[in-house]
Each structure stands twice: as C-alpha cells, then as structure tokens.
C-alpha cells in the first residue's frame, strides 16, 4: 500500500469563496474587516498624497515665477539710485532768474533727455573699470 491518501485531490485544496464560510470564527472575520478598512484608508491616503504632490508641483512653478519676478524688481530697484541722482543733478542746476519779469513763473529743472540703453551694460562695465583704475592710482 502506498503512503498517499486515498481521498480525492479536490478535498486537499482550499476552495476560494466569495461568501464567508459558515464556520469562520468571529475574530477572523473581525480581522478581515479590519484589513479591508485599512486597505480603504491606504487607498484614500494614496489619492490624497497624489493630490498633495500635484499641489506642490504647482507651488514650485508659482515660486519659480515669483523668483524671476523678484529678480526683475531687484534690477529695477537697483537702477532707482541712478534715476534719483539724475533728477537731483537736474534739479540742482535750476537757473537763477536774471530778471524779475514774471513773479508767477516757477523755475524748472534742466530738460532730461532719454538715451537708448541697449549698450548700458557695456557702458556701465566701462565706467566701473575707469572708476577702479582711478581708485587704484590714488
């Protein structure tokens, strides 16, 4: 006689069932339900994490736009001292009236002229180089 069981093979394999078998213990059913709830929570967490990641990417794009805008504002503010200096120089050279012709006229500053600035970086570098040479001599 062989050492194998004479029972049919199908009784040795577990049969998957969609409905819970009648003989399962309540503790096992509670654990299965707990794991199902945990799976649902993990799926919700995954979806929420994906939403947060998308919002962070949008925030990154907005911050890069803000950063480039800040650089532009810094450039404009860095040039204001030149504008104010030009206005101050023009205001300092207000001509004194030679004759008291009209008492109601207000002396105006010198006329300011617009100069194209396409070569401004090269001119500024040249002016800074000349300033450094003069300070090196002194």
Swiss-Prot record:
Q: Does the keyword Endoplasmic reticulum apply?
A: no
Instruction: Reply yes or no: does the keyword Nucleus apply.
Output: yes
The cross-references to InterPro entries, in alphabetical order and at most eight, read: DASH_Dad2 (IPR013963)
Region Disordered: list its residue ranges.
1-25, 116-138
Task: Write out the annotated subcellular location.
Answer: Chromosome, Centromere, Kinetochore; Cytoplasm, Cytoskeleton, Spindle; Nucleus
One Pfam entry name: DASH_Dad2
Q: Which GO terms describe its biological process?
A: attachment of mitotic spindle microtubules to kinetochore; attachment of spindle microtubules to kinetochore; cell division; mitotic sister chromatid biorientation; protein transport along microtubule to mitotic spindle pole body
- Superkingdom of the source? Eukaryota
CC per GO annotation: cytoplasm; DASH complex; kinetochore; microtubule; mitotic spindle; mitotic spindle midzone; mitotic spindle pole body
Q: Which UniProt keywords apply?
A: Cell cycle, Cell division, Centromere, Chromosome, Chromosome partition, Cytoplasm, Cytoskeleton, Kinetochore, Microtubule, Mitosis, Nucleus
| Extent of Polar residues compositional bias | 1-14
Principal localization reads nucleus
Q: How does it assemble?
A: Component of the DASH complex consisting of ASK1, DAD1, DAD2, DAD3, DAD4, DAM1, DUO1, HSK3, SPC19 and SPC34, with a stoichiometry of one copy of each subunit per complex. Multiple DASH complexes oligomerize to form a ring that encircles spindle microtubules and organizes the rod-like NDC80 complexes of the outer kinetochore. DASH complex oligomerization strengthens microtubule attachments. On cytoplasmic microtubules, DASH complexes appear to form patches instead of rings.
In the record, the note on similarity to other proteins reads: Belongs to the DASH complex DAD2 family.
Q: What does this protein do?
A: Component of the DASH complex that connects microtubules with kinetochores and couples microtubule depolymerisation to chromosome movement; it is involved in retrieving kinetochores to the spindle poles before their re-orientation on the spindle in early mitosis and allows microtubule depolymerization to pull chromosomes apart and resist detachment during anaphase.
Name of protein: DASH complex subunit DAD2
The record lists the lineage as: Eukaryota, Fungi, Dikarya, Ascomycota, Pezizomycotina
């Amino acid at each position: 006689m062989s050492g194998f069981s004479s029972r049919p093979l199908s009784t040795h394999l577990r049969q998957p069932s969609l409905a819970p078998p009648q003989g399962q213990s309540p503790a096992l059913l509670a654990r299965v339900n707990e794991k199902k709830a945990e799976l649902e929570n993990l799926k919700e967490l995954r979806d929420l994490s994906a939403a947060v990641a998308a919002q962070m990417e949008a925030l990154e794009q907005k911050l890069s736009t803000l950063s480039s805008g800040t650089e532009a504002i810094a450039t404009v503010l860095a040039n204001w001292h030149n504008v104010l200096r030009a206005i101050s120089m023009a205001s300092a050279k207000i001509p004194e009236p030679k004759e008291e012709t009209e008492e109601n006229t207000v002396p105006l500053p010198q006329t300011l002229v617009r100069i194209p600035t396409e070569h401004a970086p090269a001119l500024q570098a040249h002016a800074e180089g000349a300033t450094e040479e003069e300070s090196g001599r002194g």
